[in-house]
UniProtKB/Swiss-Prot annotation:
Protein name: Nitrogenase iron protein
CDD domains: NifH
Gene: nifH
EC number(s) per entry: 1.18.6.1
Keyword ATP-binding: yes
InterPro entries in UniProt: NifH/chlL_CS, NifH/frxC, Nitrogenase_Fe_NifH, P-loop_NTPase
Keyword terms, alphabetized: 4Fe-4S, ADP-ribosylation, ATP-binding, Iron, Iron-sulfur, Metal-binding, Nitrogen fixation, Nucleotide-binding, Oxidoreductase
The record's free-text note on cofactor binding: Binds 1 [4Fe-4S] cluster per dimer.
Length: 293
């Protein structure tokens, strides 16, 4: 099978890295050959696969030796659970330079040094938060990742972020082959969450590829720096990640999304009771003015 390059996006803190690593562990269990490229300065995209606090990043190691040209592939590529190949792009210190540029430099280095071996089935790019700048859009802008999955939940800001990411996909889909593969709902146990994400997916022209229920075993595994698949392979949550993996392997629905307008998104949120209808009579009024009324 041809190598599939997938990028995982979503709001910061939504559980992208945890979901990605559990998905990858499930794919590895199926015998798939995989590489994860962390595209986040936090460098937490591979820690559950490697049982590590944080992998040494390409940008950190380049700074230590002088430049990225002075690095060897074995310096930055580690092998973890299920023979998954792991690399972290990293970025500059907070407040200095552009972390997005680190992503560009790191992926170019991995390509030039032969990290993308011929027998890989999947490459996953775990990307920082929203598409906030051109650097973090690099995996889709440069046609590296052609398949995008957005991790979201039934919370308002997670849905806003998912919609914004769709706008970024549309921009680059016009000039390349990037497509949206679907939404992964990483549940926060909000009311009617699965119905809401299915409705959002339909509105933007895609699918909710899987609903991952909330389960404390995910945190128990994380404390041990392990995926659920490895920590407790027989639990129900491990089977959820296996189902997600199977659905992604079989997925043929790859679309150019149609992002919602802000009004459409707010109407959907009001329909499901996430947002209350706006009362225009209270806008701009102080507490004193409201009490006097």
């Amino acid at each position: 099978m041809a190598m599939r390059q997938c990028a995982i996006y979503g709001k910061g803190g939504i559980g992208k890295s945890t979901t990605t690593q559990n998905l990858v562990a499930a794919l590895a269990e199926m015998g798939k050959k995989i590489m994860i490229v962390g595209c986040d300065p936090k460098a937490d995209s591979t820690r559950l696969i490697l049982h590590a606090k944080a992998q040494n990043t390409i940008m950190e190691m380049a700074a230590e030796v002088g430049s990225v040209e002075d690095l060897e592939l074995e310096d930055v590529l580690q092998i973890g659970y299920g023979n998954v190949r792991c690399a972290e792009s990293g970025g500059p210190e907070p407040g200095v330079g552009c972390a997005g540029r680190g992503v560009i430099t790191a992926i170019n280095f991995l390509e030039e040094e032969g990290a993308y071996v011929d027998d890989l089935d999947f490459v996953f790019y775990d990307v920082l938060g929203d598409v906030v700048c051109g650097g973090f859009a690099m995996p889709i802008r440069e046609n590296k990742a052609q398949e995008i999955y957005i991790v979201c939940s039934g919370e308002m800001m997670a849905m806003y972020a998912a919609n914004n990411i769709c706008k970024g996909i549309v921009k680059y889909a016009k000039t390349g082959k990037v497509r949206l593969g679907g939404l992964i709902c990483n549940s926060r146990n909000t009311d009617r969450e699965d119905e809401l994400i299915i409705a959002l997916a339909e509105k933007i022209g895609t699918q909710m590829i899987h609903f991952v229920p909330r389960d404390n075993i995910v945190q128990r595994a994380e404390i041990r720096r392990m995926t659920v698949i490895e920590y407790d392979p027989n639990c129900s949550q491990a089977n959820e990640y296996r189902q997600l993996a199977q659905k992604i392997v079989a997925n043929t629905m790859k679309v150019i999304p149609v992002p919602c307008t802000m009004d459409e998104l707010e109407e959907l949120l009001m329909e499901f009771g996430i947002m209350e209808e706006e009362d225009t009579t209270i806008i701009g009024k102080t507490a004193a003015e409201e009490n006097a009324a």
